[in-house]
């Protein structure tokens, strides 16, 4: 009886729910169509490659060889062209210095369509902040990258590198090529943990380290989410196994960072512990963050501390891994430059047992080779912005506020109008006389303008120490049967790893 009475009500309720859901879907679709129309109208003056009716350029971008496909598009469509991920997300893809300057000399925010996926892990740190809050954090963090702070890190870079090289001695004795990318990643994270938290893993045994596994997992899962349209919706993503795995990894990473912050704050309250911290041979990144204040005397909150630490770990780990790995690949590919770098490093080290801060500035040829490697294999091949005001480019074409910009660094660095013979490895491009007249936005491995990479000096110093010690211990050569296949993810990776042969050198230097 009761069921019979309720049945019409339940039916009506189900009908209304269906109508509401349908209306929401229609409104969402209408909103997306309006956005599509607005974006298409904004980019109407920019011709580009043909698009798929549903996926836009996404299918082309996800294929192997997509980086060189974009370079070919850049030759066909000078300055810039539209780039569509599906039918509702469209960027103006730029790869010309004057176009890059028009956008990157300003302080426009990062594109939310891409970088909002990072928020669950790294929070609102320097990478994703904009406006006055970004300026405040940038100012507070800048002292953490002063050369007086960076000087003691040279010994930390060397310590972690030598542990990796000892591991490579054993692998090299097998007379087989092996993938260096994973080991370089372990070393880079060990270094970063020492510089950030004041502690690392003395044996590089990160496979059993939950924090290391979480950071590695989060990086790969974020890339997977960006590449998969069905994962762009938060509600859908958190219901999937990958979404739940992402949340678990986030919790592990956050719990670790929160606990380290809590312990460090407690130590600073204890006078004896505070003196120990002050007497250490170096201050780590967390020490500096805990001490900074703005003009009003306000410190970073715990949430802000965690966001900046997590941002530093995210930005400083994979990018350095990519840069070092591709540099060693270039050294194997061009043995004549490898030998010149090695001779320079030997001359600088002399009778010393290890490198000093002042030695880094003397590595001129190694630095030129490193920059040429960054040109051909930029660690971050593509970055994104969202215009907060209109922009007019040098050729008179313009975009309105709200438009999305993709700076394709890989294509910019292979732009033949800027770089003659762009596929040729020529370190002398970066000699003082050749670099003097170059456009300031022609070479952007660390971005450029007011929102450039705050940690670029830290990264350059680390890569110099690591690569110099590598060249002192080993001669690197290619495995022709396992040449790397470039894959553009959050960083530039190789689909099949970077496999090299290593031949130990009879020298005590670098040990």
Swiss-Prot record:
Entry's Gene Ontology molecular function annotations: heme binding; heterocyclic compound binding; iron ion binding; monooxygenase activity; oxidoreductase activity, acting on paired donors, with incorporation or reduction of molecular oxygen, reduced flavin or flavoprotein as one donor, and incorporation of one atom of oxygen
Primary location group: endoplasmic reticulum
EC primary class: oxidoreductase
Membrane topology (UniProt): Peripheral membrane protein
Binding site for heme: 315, 453
Keywords, ordered alphabetically: Endoplasmic reticulum, Heme, Iron, Membrane, Metal-binding, Microsome, Monooxygenase, Oxidoreductase
GO BP, sorted A to Z: biphenyl metabolic process
UniProt EC number: 1.14.14.1
UniProt subcellular location: Endoplasmic reticulum membrane; Microsome membrane
Cofactor: heme
Signal peptide (UniProt feature, chain positions): none
Alphabetized Pfam families for the sequence: p450
Cellular component aspect of the GO annotation: endoplasmic reticulum membrane
UniProt-listed InterPro entries: Cyt_P450 (IPR001128), Cyt_P450_CS (IPR017972), Cyt_P450_E_grp-I (IPR002401), Cyt_P450_sf (IPR036396), Cytochrome_P450_Monoox (IPR050196)
Reactions that this protein is recorded to catalyse: an organic molecule + reduced [NADPH--hemoprotein reductase] + O2 = an alcohol + oxidized [NADPH--hemoprotein reductase] + H2O + H(+)
UniProt family annotation: Belongs to the cytochrome P450 family.
Purpose of the protein: Cytochromes P450 are a group of heme-thiolate monooxygenases. In liver microsomes, this enzyme is involved in an NADPH-dependent electron transport pathway. It oxidizes a variety of structurally unrelated compounds, including steroids, fatty acids, and xenobiotics.
UniProt protein name: Cytochrome P450 4B1
Origin organism lineage: Eukaryota, Metazoa, Chordata, Craniata, Vertebrata
Chain's gene name: Cyp4b1
């Amino acid at each position: 009886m009761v069921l019979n009475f309720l049945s019409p009500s339940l039916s009506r309720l189900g009908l209304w729910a269906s109508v509401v859901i349908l209306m929401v879907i229609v409104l969402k679709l209408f909103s997306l169509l309006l956005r599509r129309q607005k974006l298409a109208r904004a980019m109407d003056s920019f011709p580009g490659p043909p698009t798929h009716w549903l996926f836009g350029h996404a299918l082309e971008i996800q294929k192997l060889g997509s980086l060189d496909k974009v370079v070919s598009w850049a030759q066909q469509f000078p300055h810039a062209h539209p780039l569509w991920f599906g039918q509702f997300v469209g960027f103006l893809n730029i790869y010309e210095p004057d176009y890059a300057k028009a956008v990157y000399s300003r302080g426009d925010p990062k594109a939310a369509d891409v970088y909002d996926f990072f928020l669950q892990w790294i929070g609102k740190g320097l990478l994703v902040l904009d406006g006055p809050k970004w300026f405040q954090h940038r100012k507070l963090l800048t002292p953490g990258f002063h050369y007086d702070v960076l000087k003691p890190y040279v010994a930390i870079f060397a310590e972690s590198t030598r542990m990796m090289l000892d591991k490579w001695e054993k692998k090299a004795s097998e007379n087989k090529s092996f993938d260096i990318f994973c080991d370089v990643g372990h070393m880079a994270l060990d270094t970063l943990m020492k510089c950030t938290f004041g502690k690392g893993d003395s044996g590089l045994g990160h496979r059993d380290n939950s924090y290391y596994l979480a950071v590695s997992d989060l990086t790969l899962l974020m890339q997977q989410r960006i590449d998969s349209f069905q994962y762009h919706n938060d509600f859908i993503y958190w219901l999937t196994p990958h979404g739940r795995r992402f949340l678990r990894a986030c919790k592990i990473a956050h719990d670790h960072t929160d606990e380290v912050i809590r312990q460090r704050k407690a130590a600073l309250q204890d006078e004896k512990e505070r003196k120990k911290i002050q007497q250490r041979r170096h201050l780590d990144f967390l020490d500096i963050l805990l001490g900074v204040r703005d003009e009003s005397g306000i410190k970073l909150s715990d949430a802000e501390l965690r966001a900046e630490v997590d941002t530093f770990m995210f930005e400083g780990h994979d990018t350095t891994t990519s840069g070092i790995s591709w540099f060693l690949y270039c050294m194997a590919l061009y043995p004549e430059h490898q030998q010149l770098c090695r001779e320079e490093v030997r001359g600088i080290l002399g009778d010393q047992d290890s490198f000093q801060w002042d030695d880094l500035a003397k590595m001129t040829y190694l630095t030129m080779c490193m920059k040429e490697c960054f040109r051909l294999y930029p660690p971050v091949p593509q970055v994104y912005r969202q215009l907060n005001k209109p922009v007019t480019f040098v050729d008179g074409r313009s975009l309105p506020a709200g438009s999305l910009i993709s700076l394709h660094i890989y294509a910019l660095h292979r732009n033949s109008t800027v770089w003659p013979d762009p596929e040729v490895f020529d370190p002398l491009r970066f000699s003082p006389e050749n670099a003097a007249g170059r456009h300031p936005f022609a070479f952007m491995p660390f971005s450029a303008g007011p929102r450039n990479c705050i940690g670029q000096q830290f990264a350059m110093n680390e890569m110099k120490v690591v690569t110099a010690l590598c060249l002192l211990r080993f001669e690197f050569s290619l495995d022709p049967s396992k040449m790397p296949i470039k894959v553009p993810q959050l960083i530039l990776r190789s689909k099949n790893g970077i496999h090299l042969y290593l031949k130990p050198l009879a020298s005590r230097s670098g040990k």
